[in-house]
């Protein structure tokens, strides 16, 4: 199974320079960041995968530098705040401010997918970065495919356990499979 995923490692085969850079230096960055050891000591994660996702959210917050972070999952807030100190944590259902840079983190196991599609996605724009957790379950995979081909979304990255969605319509719509 691991050998089948090898072709999706470290940005191999990605032609877009910006997508390659994002995959290589944000998603699959392996160098230890300044806050990793402190976060490990202060906040205990229930599983190794959740710790890995916390590190990913740290790197995404560091890359995107959002002014606001919207989520209902509080487990990852310390990682997001460590990645971007200026970011303010807000309730997911208060996502109506499209003038600021936003990071939206959603766990598909803890949210109504139809409500997400009808109530939250219309407020996402090019200043929004959406992170979708819990993709590796049957119905969640179906929703992810629906989300990828939605008129709202732009470039998407499927990391098997999580998905990342950009809403910039000025770029050609692409879907990348990334071994995370």
Give each language-model segment a name:
Residues 1-125, 136-180:
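A short alpha-helical cap/connector motif
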Residues 128:
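Glycine-centered, small-residue-biased loops immediately flanking beta-strands
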